[in-house]
Amino acid sequence: NQFHYFFSDPNPGDIIVFRPNGNEKSHYYVRRVIAVPGDKVIIKNGAVYVNGKLYNETTDVASIEDAGLAVDEIELKEDEYFVLGDNRNNSEDSRYANIGNIKKEYIVGKAWFRIGSIGDMGFLD
């Protein structure tokens, strides 16, 4: 949904579509918002903490093996979002410098429907 974020801001748990660093030549990335502007994020002992509290995962995810940049606390600026892929140990996301924190202007829209193999289709939470 390309219009959703014209009227509201992304929330933790939202699945967004974006182009890293606004690169129009890049393919689209689909990742889950973990933290929003003003939040502080750190990954320790394989778990995500936002503002000092354990992040409440809405899906089953593996313990994180590589905290990347989030080994040290990251404070999000006014227009930044911290995103992670649901496949935590095989995902290019905000933990890595080539993706980093996502600026709102780079967000293309909100994902709302999944199409996969037969039986793996449906609306996203």
Report each predicted region and the residues it spans.
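Soluble "head" domains of membrane/secretory-pathway proteins
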Residues: 1-125
